[in-house]
Amino acid sequence: MTKEERIAAIDAAIGHGQMMTDDIVHKGSLQNKVICGCRTGYKFKMNNLSYRGVWISTLENISLKVDGEEVSHKDMSIQLRDFLCNVDETGNNTDVFWAAKDECWIIVNKVGGLSAGDHTLEIEVTKRNDFGHSFGEAEEGYAENAHEFQHPTVGKQKIVCRIEEA
């Protein structure tokens, strides 16, 4: 197979189907966060973005709007098992792996939480690929043509979720 044929095969594979799901928010998981009887925010589960798991450091950005209002990154954290960090700090945690069956929560600090009823969540997750394919020998092909490294995958979802009790 020539170099050009390998490039064409990789471009064809990358251009078809994506590894990341657009079913990001786990249905039925939206709930208020309550501490000592006070609503301090809300949280929801994120579905795993890949059938094989995800390195947290590959999450380049998580954007969230709730009922049309953008949520500030400073108010948003990600929790995976006993690991908790601000969403802006995921790239610094290269040793944290989100296995396929692990629960992952997005936690938002908001005094009063959310009212009972339906809420529209719009989430966008930008994920850098954690591995790639070379169409050349050794490192040939990675520098200028490693499409999967240079073009992160973006998953988007708009979903209506319900909180039964405020």
Task: Give the role of each language-model region.
Residues T2-A166:
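Terminal leader/tail segments of proteins
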